[in-house]
Amino acid sequence: MDLGLQDKHAIVTGGSRGIGKAIARELAREGADVAIVARNKADLEATARELAAETNRRIVPLAADVTSKEQVDRMVAEAAQQLGGLHILVNSGSAPGGSATATGPIETVIDEDLLQDFNVKYVGALRCSRAVIPFMKTEGWGRIINISGGTPATPAISAAAPAMPAWCT
């Protein structure tokens, strides 16, 4: 399949494993160079080596925590510099291991856990999107893809993830 991604430059948050890793792999198979982002540097480096060997594309591992504006801004600037620009952002990051902090019956959920889940999934995606838009405007082309999903056993993350599309039109 040709998605017209040859020589495009992408960032995939949550790119060291799971859905993010699978998306990074497919973007690279379509000809994009990809910066994969997650918190764990060792996992990122192993995934980058694996995907680069599979796809013969440039895979750049960048450790960053999307709950930190400073880390997001640094990561996006570094990705743009190493890749030579930015065209695509895939927001697929979530809490470590894809789990949510705030779980269980509502009466047991504490605000700090709920806010942490929102800070990772929703506000983290917003931070990344805000940071990449100037680079996409410079390129004259860009796409932002938000990955969300419903997980009935983790109500906080289920509430946070659907909030993402509300600000994307």
What is each residue range found by the language model?
Residues 9, 16-18:
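Conserved glycine-rich cofactor-binding loop
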Residues 30-47:
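Conserved glycine-rich Rossmann-like NAD(P)H-binding loop of the short-chain dehydrogenase/reductase
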Residues 41-42, 63-75, 111:
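The beta1-alpha1 cofactor-binding region of Rossmann-like NAD(H)/NADP(H)-dependent oxidoreductases
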Residues 54-58, 78-91, 110:
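A glycine-rich helix->loop->beta "capping" turn
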Residues 74-81, 100-108, 112-119:
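Active-site Tyr-X3-Lys motif and surrounding loop/helix of classical short-chain dehydrogenase/reductase
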Residues 77, 120-138:
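Amphipathic alpha-helical dimer-interface segment in Rossmann-like NAD(P)H-dependent oxidoreductases
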Residues 87, 107-126, 141, 145, ...:
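Catalytic Tyr-X3-Lys loop
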Residues 95-99, 111, 143-168:
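Catalytic loop of short-chain dehydrogenase/reductase
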